[in-house]
């Protein structure tokens, strides 16, 4: 196909006469715009080589990128590939191209477009006003000569953005890869004619890039010299914001003379530096003119303070090859070496501070070997339609290809493990299907004209559909579950409305027709936020829904230098000459400083008190050791960059082994515990081994987990509905069938969670618990209906800021907030809690109208809490240089006591040297504490505590009265049986049941008691306690006497309201539903009848509306159609009994630890004091209330003294867990450790949210970053991972769609395909928080915004219009943390300093 319209005006018909009206939508003929080769940056390996071309490539290195509309981005690409029709060598030398090197060659019947990758794209000749479309490259080439394009043409609107003289000129050509632009203007250079030249001079047989024009009419202009030795060369650029850049050029003679002068001044022998260069290279004609430096000469925003040095400078070999790149601080950041014989053929390169990578070529100029002295090396073997790649670990990969030139594609890939994947492409090289190693095929349906994906069908037959407007913008997408997102755009192609799958609508407003930056956004709640922008597109101010303003300051390079928020909070940032962040200062002047090595790796963080934390790196920038407060952790890597050994602060080691595809297959921990992993052909985990426990994992066709078996016995089962939503998880716990059922509304939002427990023998329902969720019209989850309680309604303002809480129709809690939306006053009846903050945003005080509970907080310069003062007592805290709590000094009227906390280097508790001076213990290398001052401990091979026995001091006569605690676990390492004995007699025994998510649902406790005969033995009948949950939060505790229910602050583990109901009262609330009543007496003879499920749902909804006295019009119409009234239905309902309930407010400390229970009358009904690790020190409980909540997420078990902590049990005496972290190293290096600063940090679950990064291989790196660009901005791919509830992680990120060249640097985005295991490094960014995790899982499913190559400081901030991977992950995390912040002061402070507010 030629890519020309099927019927063009002027074409002749078979029987004569021309066509008057053409069709722009259908293309005819042989393909046009086909490239001579595949894209150099497409398929790459190593550092990097394109094996399809056999070429050494560097797909993109950015030297200049200042923010603004149509910014001047100077980036370099290199390819050793040589096209047969090259353009002349550009100003960066042979093999190198920059965007301005685009050139169009005009030949008799062919147009040859030379792109900035060194390729040639071949188009047919174009008539004036005609266009050619390259389907393989998604690129339009249009010849001027008409005022308008056909109305149906995709480029019609973009064409009208051009000045009329450009549109009407038949001598100009224009190219674009998107209907949104920009246009690349291909014209000619105006020149001064020679004296004897005949005028008018003919136009040259080529066109060069003269500028860019976007859809708003903004321009970027390339200024070319009209006369002299640099005639036709670019010597200046004016970007879209009005900045002027001067490009300093040199000739070979000038460079030779400069080299001779440097040799003379340096007293050295001048090297051979010829005055001229050969006029032709393998890369095209060469005039010897090179770019020496780029200066910023005019800056409209900073006219008086221009940089005194060039933004970038280049060094050259005597043969005119690019040898070095220097950044704006004059630091050399890149160096290159070339073949002695073939000019421009790169044989080595390096980033400053990184090893040199070398390359060897065969006689045809193809790379045969890539040599890496500090990592993997590769060899390449070329055969017809087959390339074999072998690395230095002897792993072989074979690529099978079809097609030639620009249509060559990899159709089959043989992996190192022998597995094979295959791909199918259409006639123009677009992906149509992929078959994985298991033989399963995913099909892709691209649009015939645009190539945009319109449908994806997965191997299980489920499909996703995508729809676009005439300008190739996504207008709607429907997932396999039927949920849909929709987008609307204005006439300029700007997003004006987006509808999420749950129906939430976000609107965008614009006040400037020449800008794509919104002036306001409006979310689903109707809350409006406004923004103002600089001429460079930088956010200057952000006004939230309440009218509160945040202001931003920037430097000339686009970096944020200050953020000013309400309430006087400001943050200041400083940068060095390379643009690296070197200092952050808060409002109080507390400054944190940063230091870097030559490669740009962060080596030192200096805290405000001067303490230093350092990191050392290997040759590739991977951290090999970190030192904090004199304690060091180290990491070792193999040649493939995989971690193979960790060395803890104690000198103990964890080792790792991998398969040939870099998947982890064995991990041996610090204590010798070994775990092994096996994967199927597609990479899914199918078998894991853990010291005798063998788990098999089973999946359905959609790769959803269906069940697991452990040692041959079924563990959990997962069930899904037809939409793919999880509906049930079940397993057997201590013989009981335990199931969790999930219900959803029509928008896919969780509506209910129903837990059931059945008897092992009779299948009798022993326990059930349901939590329901409801959403308001704006999509906020503002209602929760706890089991057997009235609805809990959260009252909000703006975009969801909490202002109050109601239980049923009764308001209970009210909140007052400041201009930063921080809580300043909480009211509960007569109870009032006033909260104040320091100028730096830290918690300063919490004062009650009951003075005895007042608290004041004092912080040091490092942000550590050093004192809590109250009328009862004062506690002062001391820390080690690693931030660990080392001591507490408590003073009161009759008390003055110091308690030290001593740990080994890895954080394991040691005996206090003052109290136990004779102790020889200095560390626990395996992190298993075997003894302390009170007990002896034993562990099994899984590292689980199995026995704890009283320690009998030496010299004490043994009487065999020591107490022994024994712990027994199931195959999932959950405590299921506990006993405590003395004199070989049981004192207490307990057994525990769990649901398939690992949440405890019941415990049975037998205690020693005297029977009727006077004999002491365990009770025959256990005391049974049942538990109910809302996600990861324990909300219900019920025994035979009472039910206690807890309502937590939204998104946190901090309890807010306690509701206690006598069990006898609960029995009175039992009633039939309306549906049950009608079914029991609805038969023709008065007997029972079974209603269809749809009718039951309608009756349930009607009943809930009647009970709430809010019957909808829809329900009234339905009843009327049946000849019924609301009153009639109400008369059929069983009466509702409201039980007597005791309601108390939890008064908690800054961590969420309950300190008091406040009655509705404002009196203190219960009060307690704890030590820093959650041990109860004192309790005032006149009403005998049961208050078992301890540190967030913890429940006290009286029988064992342990605190149940969701995934495991916490021993408050040791300040650590009794089993290892179920997520292993993902939760930290010490698997037993609770946060070592418990007064500031909490761990409600023992899991966490991770921020992961990995290299952009296209940027040439293999470590956690690929090296800085010349102004110091690190480029790496960043994404987030959260626990998936199945013992693993699910990840999400932002990626450039990259389906065609038309996607561009600011093209459509897509969800990245990431895994936790593939990361170069993952860092903990949020301790366990189910609200954050669930919020992020929702973010992972959302359609991505448009991709931006620049970070947020260059493009819209926190608006989601343009995002690179780093900004998307940062903003998603901060948004979810904000939604889930509740009253967590520490988290709020972090928000303030990360720009969320």
UniProtKB/Swiss-Prot annotation:
Region (28 X approximate tandem repeats): 330-1186
Keywords of the record: Repeat
Sequence repeat placement: 330-352, 353-374, 375-417, 418-438, 439-460, 461-481, 482-502, 503-525, 526-546, 547-567, 568-588, 589-609, 610-629, 630-650, 651-671, 672-691, 692-711, 712-734, 735-758, 808-828, 829-850, 851-871, 872-894, 895-930, 931-959, 960-984, 985-1019, 1162-1186
Keyword set includes Repeat: yes
Record InterPro entries: DUF6531, RHS, Rhs_assc_core, RHS_domain, RHS_repeat, T6SS_VgrG/RHS, YD
Region of interest (Disordered), ranges: 1292-1312
Protein function: Rhs elements have a nonessential function. They may play an important role in the natural ecology of the cell.
Protein name, UniProt field: Protein RhsC
Annotated gene: rhsC
């Amino acid at each position: 196909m030629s890519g020309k319209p099927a019927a063009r005006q002027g074409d002749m018909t078979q029987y004569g006469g021309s066509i008057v009206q053409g069709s722009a939508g259908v293309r005819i003929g042989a393909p046009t715009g086909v490239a001579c080769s595949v894209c150099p940056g497409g398929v790459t390996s190593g550092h990097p080589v394109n094996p399809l071309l056999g070429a050494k490539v560097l797909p993109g290195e950015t030297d200049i990128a200042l923010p603004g509309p149509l910014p001047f981005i100077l980036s370099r690409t290199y390819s050793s590939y040589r096209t047969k029709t090259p353009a002349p060598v550009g100003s960066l030398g042979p093999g190198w191209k920059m965007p301005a090197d685009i050139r169009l060659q005009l030949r008799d019947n062919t147009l040859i477009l030379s792109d900035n990758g060194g390729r040639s794209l071949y188009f047919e000749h174009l008539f004036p006003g005609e266009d050619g479309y390259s389907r393989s490259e998604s690129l339009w080439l249009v010849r001027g000569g008409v005022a308008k394009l056909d109305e149906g043409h995709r480029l019609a609107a973009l064409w009208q953005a051009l000045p009329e003289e450009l549109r009407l000129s038949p001598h100009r050509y224009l190219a674009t890869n998107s209907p949104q632009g920009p246009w690349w203007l291909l014209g000619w250079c105006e020149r001064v004619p020679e004296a004897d030249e005949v005028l008018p001079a003919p136009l040259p047989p080529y066109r060069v890039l003269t500028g860019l024009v976007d859809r708003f009419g903004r321009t970027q202009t390339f200024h070319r010299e009209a006369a002299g030795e640099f005639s036709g060369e670019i010597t200046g650029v004016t970007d879209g914001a009005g900045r002027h850049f001067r490009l300093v050029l040199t000739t070979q003679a000038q460079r030779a003379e400069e080299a001779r002068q440097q040799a003379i001044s340096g007293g050295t022998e001048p090297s051979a530096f010829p005055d001229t260069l050969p006029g032709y290279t393998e890369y095209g004609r060469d005039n010897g003119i090179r770019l020496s430096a780029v200066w910023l000469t005019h800056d409209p925003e900073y006219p008086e303070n221009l940089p005194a040095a060039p933004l970038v400078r280049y060094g050259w070999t005597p043969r005119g090859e690019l040898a070095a790149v220097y950044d704006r601080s004059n630091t050399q950041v890149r160096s290159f070496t070339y073949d002695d014989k073939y000019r421009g053929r790169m044989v080595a390169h390096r980033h400053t501070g990184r090893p040199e990578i070398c390359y060897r070529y065969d006689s045809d100029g193809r790379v045969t070997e890539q040599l890496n002295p500090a990592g993997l090396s590769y060899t390449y073997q070329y055969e017809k339609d087959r390339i074999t790649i072998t690395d230095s670990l002897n792993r072989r990969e074979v690529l099978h290809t079809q097609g030639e030139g620009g249509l060559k594609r990899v159709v089959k890939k043989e992996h190192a493990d022998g597995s094979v994947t295959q791909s199918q492409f259409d006639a123009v090289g677009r992906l149509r299907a992929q078959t994985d190693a298991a033989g399963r095929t995913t099909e892709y349906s691209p649009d015939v004209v645009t190539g945009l994906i319109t449908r994806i069908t997965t191997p299980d037959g489920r499909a996703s559909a995508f729809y676009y407007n005439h300008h190739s913008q996504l207008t709607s997408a429907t997932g396999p579950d039927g949920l849909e997102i929709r987008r609307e755009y204005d006439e300029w192609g700007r997003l004006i409305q987006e509808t999420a799958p749950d129906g939430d609508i976000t609107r965008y407003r614009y006040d400037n027709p020449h800008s794509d930056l919104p002036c306001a956004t409006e979310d689903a709640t109707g809350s409006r936020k406004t923004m103002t922008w600089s001429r460079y597109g930088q956010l200057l101010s952000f006004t939230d829904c309440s009218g509160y303003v945040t202001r931003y300051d920037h430097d000339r390079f686009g970096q944020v230098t200050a953020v000013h928020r309400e309430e006087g909070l400001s943050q200041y940032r400083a940068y060095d000459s390379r643009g690296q962040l070197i200092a952050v200062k808060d409002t109080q002047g507390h400054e944190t400083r940063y230091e870097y090595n030559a490669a740009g790796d962060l080596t030192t963080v200096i805290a405000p008190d001067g303490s230093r934390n350092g990191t050392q790196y290997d040759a590739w920038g991977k951290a090999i050791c970190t030192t904090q407060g004199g304690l060091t952790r180290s990491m070792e890597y193999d040649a493939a960059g995989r971690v193979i050994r960790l060395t803890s602060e104690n000198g103990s080691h964890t080792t790792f082994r991998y398969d040939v595809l870099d998947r982890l297959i064995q991990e041996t921990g610090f204590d010798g515990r070994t775990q092994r992993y096996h994967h199927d052909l597609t990479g899914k985990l199918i078998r894991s081994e853990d010291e005798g426990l063998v788990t098999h994992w089973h999946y359905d066709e959609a790769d959803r987990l269906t069940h697991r078996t452990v040692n041959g016995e079924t563990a959990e089962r997962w069930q899904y509905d037809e939409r793919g939503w999880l509906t049930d998880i079940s397993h057997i716990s201590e013989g009981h069938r335990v199931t969790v059922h999930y219900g959803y509304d029509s928008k896919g939002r969780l509506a209910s969670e129903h837990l059931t427990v059945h008897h092992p023998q009779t299948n009798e329902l022993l326990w059930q618990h349901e939590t329901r969720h409801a959403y308001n019209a704006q999509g906020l989850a503002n209602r929760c209906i706890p089991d057997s309680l009235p609805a809990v309604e959260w009252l909000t303002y703006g975009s969801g800021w909490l202002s109050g809480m109601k239980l049923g129709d009764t308001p209970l809690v009210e909140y007052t907030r400041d201009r930063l939306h921080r809580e300043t006053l909480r009211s509960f009846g007569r109870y009032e809690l006033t909260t104040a903050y320091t100028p730096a945003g830290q918690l300063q005080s919490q004062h009650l109208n009951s003075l005895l509970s007042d608290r004041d907080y004092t912080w040091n310069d490092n942000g550590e809490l050093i004192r809590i003062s109250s009328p009862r007592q004062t506690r002062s805290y001391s820390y080690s240089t690693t931030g660990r709590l080392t001591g507490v000094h408590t003073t009161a009227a009759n008390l003055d006591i110091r308690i030290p906390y001593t740990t080994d280097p890895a954080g394991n508790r040691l005996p206090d040297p003052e109290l136990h001076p004779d102790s020889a213990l200095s560390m626990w290398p395996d992190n298993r504490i075997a003894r302390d001052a009170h007990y002896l401990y034993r562990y099994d091979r899984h590292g689980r505590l199995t026995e704890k026995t009283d320690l009998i001091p030496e010299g004490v006569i043994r009487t065999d009265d020591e107490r022994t605690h024994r712990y027994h676990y199931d195959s999932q390492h959950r405590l299921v049986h506990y006993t405590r004995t003395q004199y070989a007699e049981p004192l207490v025994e307990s057994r525990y049941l769990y649901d398939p998510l690992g949440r405890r649902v019941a415990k049975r406790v037998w205690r020693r008691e005297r029977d009727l005969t006077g004999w002491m033995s365990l009770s025959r009948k256990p005391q049974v306690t049942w538990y109910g949950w809302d996600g990861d939060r324990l909300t219900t505790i019920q025994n035979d006497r009472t039910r206690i229910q807890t309502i937590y602050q939204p998104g946190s583990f901090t309890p807010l309201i306690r509701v206690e109901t006598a069990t006898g009262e609960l029995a009175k609330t039992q009633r039939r539903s309306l549906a049950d009543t009608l079914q029991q007496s609805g038969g023709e003879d008065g007997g029972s009848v079974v209603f269809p499920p749809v009718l039951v749902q309608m009756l349930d909804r009607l009943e809930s509306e009647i009970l709430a006295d809010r019957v909808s019009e829809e329900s009234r119409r339905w009843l009327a159609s049946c000849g019924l009234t609301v009153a009639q239905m109400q008369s059929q309902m069983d009466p509702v009994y409201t039980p007597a309930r005791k309601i108390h407010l939890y008064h908690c400390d800054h961590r969420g630890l309950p300190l008091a229970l406040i009655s509705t009358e404002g009196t203190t009904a219960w009060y307690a004091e704890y030590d820093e690790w959650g041990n109860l020190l004192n309790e005032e409980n006149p009403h005998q209330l049961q208050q078992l909540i301890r540190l967030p997420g913890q429940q006290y078990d009286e029988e064992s003294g342990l605190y149940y902590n969701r995934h495991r049990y916490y021993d408050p005496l040791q300040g650590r867990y009794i089993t290892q972290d179920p997520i292993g190293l993902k939760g930290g290096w010490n698997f037993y450790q609770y946060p070592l600063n418990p007064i500031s940090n909490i761990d409600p679950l023992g899991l966490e949210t991770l921020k992961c990064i990995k290299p952009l291989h296209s940027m040439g790196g293999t470590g956690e970053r690929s090296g800085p660009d010349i102004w110091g901005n690190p480029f790496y791919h960043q994404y987030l991972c959260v626990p998936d509830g199945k013992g693993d992680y699910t990840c999400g990120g932002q990626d450039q769609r990259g389906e065609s060249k038309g996607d561009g640097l600011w093209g459509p985005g897509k969800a990245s395909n990431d895994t936790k295991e593939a990361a170069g490094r993952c860092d903990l960014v949020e301790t366990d928080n189910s609200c954050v995790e669930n919020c992020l899982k929702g973010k992972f499913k959302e359609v991505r915004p448009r991709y931006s190559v620049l970070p947020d400081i260059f493009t819209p901030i926190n608006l989601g219009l343009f995002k690179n991977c780093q900004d998307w992950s940062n903003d998603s995390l901060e948004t979810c943390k904000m939604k889930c912040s509740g009253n967590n002061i520490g988290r709020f402070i972090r928000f303030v300093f990360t720009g969320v507010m």
